Amino acid sequence: MTPTEQLKAILTEKYTSEDGDEYQVELKPGLTDQQIDDLEKGFPTGQIPNEIRELLKFTSGFEFYGLEEVNFVGVGQFGFEEFFPTSVQLAGDGFGNFWVLDINKNGQWGNVFYVCHDPAVIVKHSDNLAEFIKHVDEFGKKGKESNLDVIHEVTVMDIWTINNGFMDKSTALASTDEKLKLFASSLPDNFVISDLRDKPIKSGFAWGKFGPNIDKAKRHDSELLWGVEKVEKKGLLSRLFGK
């Protein structure tokens, strides 16, 4: 299904909030052709894919209980360019965590990621926008058993405490994967690498595991590959004598 088809498929669904109130998807107004033309200037190729243009004409987003709102026009609002050079901020949970759609240098609308600040983890949430809409529908129906809630409550902690999603540069250089090797060779020796290419949803990495300073983080220009500086913690003597 296209995003528009997926959204239309859930418009008649009825959900029940935690307070027992019934609710439905509430669409926001769509954009005019001129508004879409203005919006696409912010994209790498200066163009919006046809299926996204269709969606934006239909609606610019929708209201849904449990999310601040789902917004299809939040281009460049998120920041965090070290990890997502071009993105659409789709939704927030009201606590400083966001669902962000990644757009590559060719203007392709790709995966949706859940970006959490506490713990500081990035998770592949949905393969594409249509699946994200499906996951929102599932959240309304299944609550704590939904993909959205499991990632929000469980997956981020698993990545932070059990598997931080990184490999050492030496491991990447020893790989037979040429793209991975080439990316690793471009990084300083004290960097670690996360590779989410072809990884299933709920895969991710602990972007803040080595401290909150991400100014030196690097993203591959076309692949789901990231490099993060691994800052070694200094011992007491090193701190005292500046070594």
Spans of model-derived segments:
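A surface-exposed partner-binding patch
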Residues: 1-108, 148, 160-243
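Compact, glycine/acidic-enriched structural inserts
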Residues: 110-147
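Short aromatic loop motif centered on NTY/YTY
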Residues: 152-155
